[in-house]
């Protein structure tokens, strides 16, 4: 024992690791000594040592370690004095200590027991006592609130703490009673600057207060909700007892009503079995449970559908009246109206859906939606619209499974339930705007809906039973063919072209102007439009294939005229003319391509089809020294770039015929440009225009700028058919073109072109590229000298 005592000096004392707490100078508290090493360390003090009442204590980082290592102990601890020692019956000891100072420890083991050499670490000198006093007062106020919220700290603590005269001891006492993790408390112990320790303590207390306030708020709300649920449950039970006494039972009445529907509705066998099964479950459920509400909602939807097959004779269509209505509501579109009346005729004769799904494809504003409404009116069927633009979830079509929170049937079933009819016209609007994501592709979900062989057994995920959609007339609309081919294959495509200028004029006179006069509160005698004014609107204030923009402009003029009439007593009416339209709408917004007067070398006029109709497109070319390469610019797509290369390759194969020497096209690069470079351009129909431009450039022969052309060119010089002929010819007429070269393969399309366009143009169908040169160039190419223009 004497040898052990000799190891303990004034600066080396036994070290006692403590768990789950941090000690601060100034505290007086009991400590339980129970671990074997700690008991041995206590006993080694002996009875006669001068250090028997002084020990070192520090916190261990891991509270689960029974025998902590030196590295698992914090190096800042405390020096304490034992004021009382009591041996417990289980050979453990309970000591009462007074913490004296904060110390820095150098820990080691002596005879396998922890000892440490220590250096006292005092607080820094206080420079601004008043500031510290204010900060401490603020900390005490916060801690008082913290005590009220925590409900785990004795409210009398502050009375005891405030009895300290040492500000550092006050901070230490507050920190010791803070309920937080050991690491945060240890950081407070290690701070020697009293001001900084107060600030850190204040931050910790403020954060804990926020956490406790949030927890208290959540607990309060949860308690209120629980009380409300208990109250509702109590009242419901009480109501049940009262109803039983009176002989009234709403729940039984509801179930009886559902059972009656199941018995009387013409449900399919599968649907009836499903309804019976769900009703049986409902009877066994607590009426106020969430599951009961979901089951009742399912039965309401299932039994709310029109299961009874409506009489086939309900379809009664007057074909002549339907055609009259179509003509009254839609100008032009003769082929479209003819196909619609054929469709209606088959419906009238068969008295049932014929399985043909029509799909109207055309630019915005050409009347696709109104055509569908006309079909609904002609068939005397209810009309419903399913907007597919932006739909990206397959569940929008097939519905969600009942296991999902907030599950509902798909839009098709929902529309049928809303209209309560199977004889329904459903417009699938903007079918080309469907998108896809990780939840599936709605476009392919529509395959089952639109397939006549499958839609009689359509199964919505929510219903989980088959439902017959064969009586529903589905009609789709789109702006382009940009949707999956299998879906396109399910439908009959009816293309609706943009309106030509004359058609827009008639639509404006007979539909748009009367509508806007009425909508804006004007009288027919108060405003009038000349034909020239309407044409001015069409040509220079709108650029579209349809008439929506034109209607908006007419509406704008009507509003300004109304304001003018109401603002002046002298003005009773206004006449809108080509000359004064600028006063209402400002300067012209658009300009169309116009033919130039002077023929030029290396410039050809092509014809382009755009979303807003047709337009002239210039093809320019120059030569620069190089290696016989072609460069095409003007924001062109891949197809147009390939068309440029094809035209150049065909020219090279025929260069000798055009009296162009080999050196001329192998020592120069050709730069082909399409002006208005900000506008994207693509497609093969500029092939012959590019070819003509190259020949003109290499031979020096000007191109007639009264001639425009369209057609795809092959490497053999053949001219292939193109699309959008009507719009292109309209653009040629508007631009002052006299002669238009088109592919011979488009000759049959001329039957659909209005005479008002054909009569003003010399339209020449051709099949070979060399034939184009004879018409488009100012002189015959084979007789020209072999000179070039750069």
Swiss-Prot record:
Keywords of the record: ATP-binding, Cytoplasm, Hydrolase, Nucleotide-binding, Protease, Serine protease, Stress response
Gene Ontology cellular-component terms listed: cytoplasm
Catalytic activity: Hydrolysis of proteins in presence of ATP
Name recorded for this polypeptide: Lon protease
Family: Belongs to the peptidase S16 family.
UniProt subcellular location: Cytoplasm
Domain Lon proteolytic stretches: 598-779
Origin organism lineage: Bacteria, Pseudomonadati, Pseudomonadota, Alphaproteobacteria, Rickettsiales
InterPro entries: AAA+_ATPase, ATPase_AAA_core, Lon_bac, Lon_bac/euk-typ, Lon_lid, Lon_proteolytic, Lon_Prtase, Lon_prtase_N
NCBIfam families, A to Z: lon
Cross-referenced Pfam families: AAA, Lon_C, Lon_lid, LON_substr_bdg
Organism from which the protein derives: Orientia tsutsugamushi (strain Ikeda) (Rickettsia tsutsugamushi)
EC number(s) from the headed UniProt entry: 3.4.21.53
Complex and partners: Homohexamer. Organized in a ring with a central cavity.
PROSITE patterns attached to this UniProt entry: LON_N, LON_PROTEOLYTIC, LON_SER
GO MF assignments: ATP binding; ATP hydrolysis activity; ATP-dependent peptidase activity; sequence-specific DNA binding; serine-type endopeptidase activity
Disulfide bonds: none
Gene Ontology BP annotations: cellular response to heat; protein quality control for misfolded or incompletely synthesized proteins
Main localization of the protein described in the UniProt heading: cytoplasm
Residue ranges of domain Lon N-terminal in the record: 13-209
């Amino acid at each position: 024992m004497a040898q052990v005592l000799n190891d303990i000096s004034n600066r080396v004392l036994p070290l006692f690791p403590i768990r789950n707490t941090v000690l601060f100078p100034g505290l007086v508290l009991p400590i339980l000594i129970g671990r074997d090493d700690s008991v041995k360390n206590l006993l080694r003090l002996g009875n006669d040592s001068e250090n028997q009442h002084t020990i070192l204590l520090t916190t261990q980082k891991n509270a689960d370690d029974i025998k902590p290592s030196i590295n698992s102990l914090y190096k800042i601890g405390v020096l304490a004095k034992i004021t009382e020692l009591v041996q417990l019956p289980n050979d453990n000891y309970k000591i009462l200590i007074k913490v004296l100072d904060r110390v820095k420890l150098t820990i080691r083991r002596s005879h396998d027991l922890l000892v440490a050499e220590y250096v006292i670490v005092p607080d820094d000198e206080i420079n601004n006592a008043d500031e510290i006093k204010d900060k401490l007062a603020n900390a005490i106020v916060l801690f008082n609130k913290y005590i009220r919220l925590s409900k785990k700290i004795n409210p009398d603590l502050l009375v005891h703490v405030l009895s300290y005269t040492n500000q550092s001891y006050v901070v230490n006492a507050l920190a010791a009673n803070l309920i937080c993790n050991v690491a945060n408390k240890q950081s407070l112990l290690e701070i020697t600057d009293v001001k900084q320790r107060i600030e850190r303590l204040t931050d910790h207390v403020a954060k804990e207060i926020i956490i406790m306030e949030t927890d208290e708020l959540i607990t309060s709300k949860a308690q209120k909700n629980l009380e409300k649920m208990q109250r509702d449950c109590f009242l419901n039970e009480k109501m049940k007892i009262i109803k039983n006494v009176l002989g009234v039972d709403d729940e039984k009445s509801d179930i009886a009503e559902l059972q009656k529907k199941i018995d009387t509705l013409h449900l399919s066998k599968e649907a009836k079995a499903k309804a019976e099964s769900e009703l049986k479950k409902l009877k066994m459920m607590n009426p106020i449970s969430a599951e009961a509400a979901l089951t009742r909602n399912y039965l309401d939807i299932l039994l709310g559908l029109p299961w009874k097959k409506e009489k086939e004779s309900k379809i009664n269509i007057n074909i002549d009246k339907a055609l009259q209505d179509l003509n009254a509501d839609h100008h032009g579109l003769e082929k479209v109206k003819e196909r619609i009346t054929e469709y209606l005729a088959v419906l009238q004769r068969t008295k049932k859906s014929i399985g043909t799904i029509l799909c109207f494809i055309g630019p915005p504003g050409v009347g696709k939606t109104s055509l569908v409404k006309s079909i609904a009116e002609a068939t005397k069927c209810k009309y419903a619209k399913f907007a597919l633009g932006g739909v990206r979830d397959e569940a929008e079509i097939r519905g969600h499974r009942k296991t999902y929170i907030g599950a509902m049937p798909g839009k098709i079933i929902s529309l049928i339930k809303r209209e309560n009819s199977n004889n329904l016209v459903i417009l699938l609007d903007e079918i080309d705007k469907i998108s896809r994501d990780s939840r599936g592709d709605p476009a392919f979900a529509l395959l089952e809906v639109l397939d006549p062989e499958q839609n009689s057994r359509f199964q919505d995920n929510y219903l989980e039973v088959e439902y017959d959609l064969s009586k529903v007339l589905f009609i789709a609309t789109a702006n382009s063919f940009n949707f999956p081919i299998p879906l396109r294959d399910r439908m009959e495509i009816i293309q609706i072209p943009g309106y030509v200028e004359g058609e827009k004029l008639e639509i404006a006179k007979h539909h748009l102007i009367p509508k806007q006069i009425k909508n804006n509160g004007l009288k027919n005698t108060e405003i009038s439009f000349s034909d020239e004014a309407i044409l001015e609107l069409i040509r220079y204030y709108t650029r579209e294939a349809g008439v929506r923009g034109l209607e908006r402009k007419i509406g704008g003029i009507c509003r300004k005229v109304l304001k003018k009439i109401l603002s002046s007593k002298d003005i009773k009416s206004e006449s809108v003319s080509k000359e004064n339209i600028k006063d209402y709408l400002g300067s012209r917004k658009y300009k169309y391509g116009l033919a130039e007067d002077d023929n030029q070398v290396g410039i050809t006029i092509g014809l382009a089809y755009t979303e807003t109709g047709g337009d002239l497109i210039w093809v320019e070319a120059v030569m620069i020294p190089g290696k016989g390469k072609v460069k095409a610019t003007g924001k062109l797509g891949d197809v147009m770039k390939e068309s440029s290369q094809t035209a150049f390759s065909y020219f090279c194969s025929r260069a000798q015929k055009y009296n162009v020497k080999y050196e001329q096209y192998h020592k120069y690069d050709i730069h082909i440009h399409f002006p208005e470079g900000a506008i994207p351009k693509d497609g093969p129909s500029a092939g012959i225009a590019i070819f003509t431009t190259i020949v003109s450039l290499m031979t020096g022969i000007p191109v007639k700028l009264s001639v425009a052309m369209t057609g795809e060119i092959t490497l053999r010089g053949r001219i292939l058919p193109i699309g959008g002929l009507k719009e292109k010819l309209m653009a040629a007429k508007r631009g002052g073109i006299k002669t238009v070269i088109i592919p011979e393969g488009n000759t049959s399309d001329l039957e659909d072109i209005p005479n008002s366009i054909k009569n003003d143009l010399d339209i020449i169908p051709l099949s070979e590229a060399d034939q184009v040169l004879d018409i488009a160039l100012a002189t015959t190419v084979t007789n020209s000298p072999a000179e070039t223009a750069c």
